[in-house]
Amino acid sequence: MNTNDFDFELPEELIAQTPLEKRDSSKLLIIDHRQKTMVDSHFDHIIDQLNPGDALVMNNTRVLPARLYGEKPDTHGHVELLLLKNTQGDQWEVLAKPAKRLKVGSQVNFGNGHLKATIIDELEHGGRIVEFSYDGIFLEVLESLGEMPLPPYIHEKLEDAERYQTVYAKENGSAAAPTAGLHFTTDLLKKIEAKGVHLVYLTLHVGLGTFRPVSVDNLDEHDMHSEFYSLSEEAAQTLRDVKQAGGRVVAVGTTSIRTLETIGSKFQGDIQADSGWTNIFIKPGYQFKVVDAFSTNFHLPKSTLVMLVSAFAGRDFVLEAYRHAVDEKYRFFSFGDAMFVN
């Protein structure tokens, strides 16, 4: 298939720049790809789409304040580092600006020298491996000096950084939020659990590759980014029990889908505790092995995420749903509205 097969018209004013005051007051488009139906609703009604005995699977990753602004001690030139992933110990893969000034051995100071980075390797596209030195606990230093790395299409400053975290965010490590989860409130989750739905958590640390556009025409030539995931034995057992009892596995967001389908593909449809790196690219033609339904936000034209939704619900129907969302002025992308896909 061709990348342009997943294009659609999106007026810029529909790209949400700020979150709504109440997380669960966003709109929800409920689609059923078998019945070919679409229903306009609100997110707090997602509970009506869940049955007792289902499992609702959420990604509990937490976004790091991963954008650091510092300077080179020799020239006082300004430097920006964006932390991508922890490679080992105090070493991180980062995206550096301006990268050409940062050769192996270069140093960068942050916060009057409370945090220092030494370049130990050069990668392509402005990537660097750095080693940090600091006093105390790294995450606490990062919390005090770093800024939240908002997506490139959001131009307004975020008043409350916690609004770019899910209410169940726990495991530090993401460069971006698993945005389908931003709609849930603690109260809504309690109501869902009280209905007899199992709340299950996994972890996938979202990388910046999630925003990287597809640069090839032929999808078979696309090089998918890798992200770290983990599913505990307790979570895997719950999901196996749910499946065995005839319940559904309902994923919250594409990161949960990619984790579950990575594991399902690895273990021939079985759900096992597992951790590792995944670069699974789910596109039309893929046979789903674990996920029965899911919620997700509205994604960028020609993105791998639109392709993933199309793999589940069919390209033509998904693009029809997106046209409906545009006509009805749904809000798009990270702080936007949601879709529930049966």
From Swiss-Prot:
It holds the Pfam family Queuosine_synth. It comes from Streptococcus pyogenes serotype M2 (strain MGAS10270). The lineage of its organism: Bacteria, Bacillati, Bacillota, Bacilli, Lactobacillales. Its main location: cytoplasm. It catalyses: 7-aminomethyl-7-carbaguanosine(34) in tRNA + S-adenosyl-L-methionine = epoxyqueuosine(34) in tRNA + adenine + L-methionine + 2 H(+). Belongs to the QueA family. It is found in: Cytoplasm. One of its GO terms (biological process) is tRNA wobble guanine modification. GO terms for molecular function: S-adenosylmethionine:tRNA ribosyltransferase-isomerase activity. SUPFAM superfamilies: QueA-like. Monomer. Keywords: Cytoplasm, Queuosine biosynthesis, S-adenosyl-L-methionine, Transferase. Transfers and isomerizes the ribose moiety from AdoMet to the 7-aminomethyl group of 7-deazaguanine (preQ1-tRNA) to give epoxyqueuosine (oQ-tRNA). Pathway: tRNA modification; tRNA-queuosine biosynthesis. This is S-adenosylmethionine:tRNA ribosyltransferase-isomerase. Its EC number is 2.4.99.17. InterPro entries: QueA, QueA_dom1, QueA_dom2, QueA_sf. GO terms for cellular component: cytoplasm.
